[in-house]
A protein has these predicted regions:
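Amphipathic alpha-helical assembly/interaction segments
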Residues: 1-109
Length: 109
């Protein structure tokens, strides 16, 4: 069965972002595993999940709605990364690096 979302650059880049996020949060304190770590992971996973849901081809309106949700998740992720920086879990250079990938995904969505 054809999976049209796997051909989308936005889906591919957002999948790469998920992998990067999962690696990044491994360094967060263990007491954040059910807090900020979980929130960041869920926001990142939501992006390619919504892109794939929208690409399922039911309607253009539904695809746009799914992309809108993915954009919301990217903005949520950006805020959560900023929080991680402000509480000392991320350095400035790492934040900037990950934010540039978030921005790439936003531009493609």
């Amino acid at each position: 069965m054809d999976k049209p979302h796997k051909r989308l650059l936005a889906w591919k880049k957002s999948m790469d972002l998920v992998v990067e996020i999962y690696e990044l949060v491994k360094a967060f304190p263990r007491d954040e595993v059910y807090g900020l770590t979980s929130q960041i992971r869920r926001a990142s996973v939501s992006v390619p999940s919504n892109i794939s849901d929208g690409a399922a081809g039911r309607s253009v309106t539904q695809f746009r709605n799914s992309l809108s949700i993915a954009i919301g998740s990217l903005n949520e992720l950006s805020t959560q990364l900023e929080i991680a920086y402000r509480v000392g879990y991320l350095g400035r250079s790492k934040l900037d690096d990950v934010e540039s990938r978030v921005d790439q995904c936003l531009a493609l969505t």
